Amino acid sequence: MSEKTFLVEIGTEELPPKALRSLVESFAANFTVELDNAGLAHGTVQWFAAPRRLALKVANLAEAQPDREIEKRGPAIAQAFDAEGKPSKAAEGWARGCGITVDQAERLTTDKGEWLLYRAHVKGESTEALLPNMVATSLAKLPIPKLMRWGASDVHFVRPVHTVTLLLGDKVIPATILGIQSDRVIRGHRFMGEPEFTIDNADQYPEILRERGKVIADYEERKAKIKADAEEAARKIGGNADLSESLLEEVASLVEWPVVLTAKFEEKFLAVPAEALVYTMKGDQKYFPVYANDGKLLPNFIFVANIESKDPQQIISGNEKVVRPRLADAEFFFNTDRKKRLEDNLPRLQTVLFQQQLGTLRDKTDRIQALAGWIAEQIGADVNHATRAGLLSKCDLMTNMVFEFTDTQGVMGMHYACHDGEAEDVAVALNEQYQPRFAGDDLPSNPVACALAIADKMDTLAGIFGIGQHPKGDKDPFALRRAALGVLRIIVEKNLNLDLQTLTEEAVRLYGDKLTNANVVDDVIDFMLGRFRAWYQDEGYTVDTIQAVLARRPTRPADFDARMKAVSHFRTLDAAAALAAANKRVSNILAKSDEVLSDRVNASTLKEPEEIKLAMQVVVLRDKLEPYFAEGRYQDALVELAELREPVDAFFDKVMVMVDDKELRLNRLTMLEKLRELFLRVADISLLQ
């Protein structure tokens, strides 16, 4: 069977840059599924994406489905015919479904009986006939949150569509996709190359688009070119470009023919905190800031034009003129804000609502101030500095700079606090209170900052859960999952002596009578333990290891982490599987017994050598391991407990637990309970698979 290259290109108006990659990757994934479901043999499915097009190129696509033999078994002969030999309704219905009469059916005979059988040779459908529906289905499944409709038609898509190119080899596949008749026409760059041209063969793509249309259709190629050219441009001016992945992706999605240029701004603007300047350059203008080797911001920026100009200086000057007023605004706001102390913004917090049932930002500030001080006392941080940081934590939200450049919240608080002469750890805490903002983000760097960051997040968790607005499904408007994971990361990675139980109780207490959920403390703790599950799964821990630790519901995050590492190490020991099975057996035995057990094993009642040996080792280990448990040395404890494998195996091989002698039975059950309690001091290893 011959093979050909297939090309589909959807030509549109400018697509949303932040969604471009996800759109085309979904398109490729959907279409690959369609090909596989149809049984069409194919090679690589390559995707292309540019601001005004989504395209797929499939190598070595079979021209038709393979022929196939089908068999459909019908009713058993006993049910297929009545006593007079006439076909039953079941047989006739089955035959109709197969497109035959009962008389045309074959018979299938096995040692289990005889059935009606339909056999047929089905010729594979041509790829040309299948492709239009496959393309349409793949496009219909794209993750588009908001569809557009254009013109008088009822067609909906992410942006208006102008061209649809469907080529199988050199042949146009006739179809109407998204209201457009397929053709071999492709549109080039708006201002360079040929605005419109025809493509003779799918194999010519994307080279023909580059040569005639001046469009680099390969997304990764554009991105790599921007990165390399920007690095070289920065090197020429003695700096390093800030090429964050997210901005690189966005810029690559905005241009069809990237041309990297370097511009500058007035050095006087460097007196403004770099974060505000960078926010303007990256967030508003999509420019790449440039830093000197010492990490200081240079008065330059790199940007990407979408055209090759005979006079690039004109483009550079235009971009410099655009950014100058924004930088001047930042300078004005910075100077204006510093005319009063940060603390002077406190009264204005009373005018901003945090949440309707939970009060204003000033109310939240008071709670954070108290909670940060309480946390500082628990972890040995400076209580006065922590309460001071709590008091000032939201003041920068009322400044001109943060109002205009919202992403500078926190960092501007730090700069204004430094200007006011606040303690260094207080100022740093104002900046770091929102950390970690995302997975892998840095944690607060000092104890005061840790106290403030935890207080801010716990106040939100307690409040929102306290009014019954916890996350549901994918909806998490208050980012509670991120807040919970942030608290856990800070406590675990900084090894802080905090208990979720008392921490949550204190956060709830500070709300007074505002909360309506009587189970708020348990709900918050359960939610946070659930985030532990997700975190450790991402870290590569097995589900049963996590469940074994969660079964003990440890509420000290650092303690939880120590248990996780201990159980994970325990699983590598030779004795692990046998002891996990033994614990499961002990758990089942104890669960089936409703008898009241003694507080201790009666040594005089022990009879068999195996139970005497096991009982003695349990007593010895109980005393030996007590300091291990007190110090959180769970890994060492489980290594010691692994020595019980031999006496436990011997006990179950030689000793019957559920004997008729009640005194003997209860004594053996008590011993097993004491054995299990030792393991439960760490985790429920009976849950290990």
Curated annotation (Swiss-Prot):
Q: InterPro entries annotated for this entry? A: DALR_anticod-bd, Gly-tRNA-synth_bsu, Gly-tRNA-synth_heterodimer
> Gene Ontology terms, cellular component aspect?
cytosol
Task: Report the locations given in the UniProt record.
Answer: Cytoplasm
State if Ligase is listed as a keyword: yes
| Annotated catalysed reactions | tRNA(Gly) + glycine + ATP = glycyl-tRNA(Gly) + AMP + diphosphate
The EC number(s) attached to this protein equal 6.1.1.14
* Pfam families xref list: DALR_1, tRNA_synt_2f
Q: Which GO terms describe its biological process?
A: arginyl-tRNA aminoacylation; glycyl-tRNA aminoacylation
Which domain of life does the protein's organism represent? Bacteria
Q: What is its main location?
A: cytoplasm
Keyword line:
Aminoacyl-tRNA synthetase, ATP-binding, Cytoplasm, Ligase, Nucleotide-binding, Protein biosynthesis
Q: Please give the SUPFAM superfamilies that the UniProt record associates with this protein.
A: HD-domain/PDEase-like
Query: Which cysteine-cysteine pairs are annotated as disulfide bonds in the entry?
Result: none
GO molecular function terms attached to this record: arginine-tRNA ligase activity; ATP binding; glycine-tRNA ligase activity
Protein family membership? Belongs to the class-II aminoacyl-tRNA synthetase family.
Q: How does it assemble?
A: Tetramer of two alpha and two beta subunits.
Write down what this protein is called: Glycine--tRNA ligase beta subunit
Source organism of the structure:
Shigella boydii serotype 4 (strain Sb227)
Instruction: Name the gene.
Output: glyS
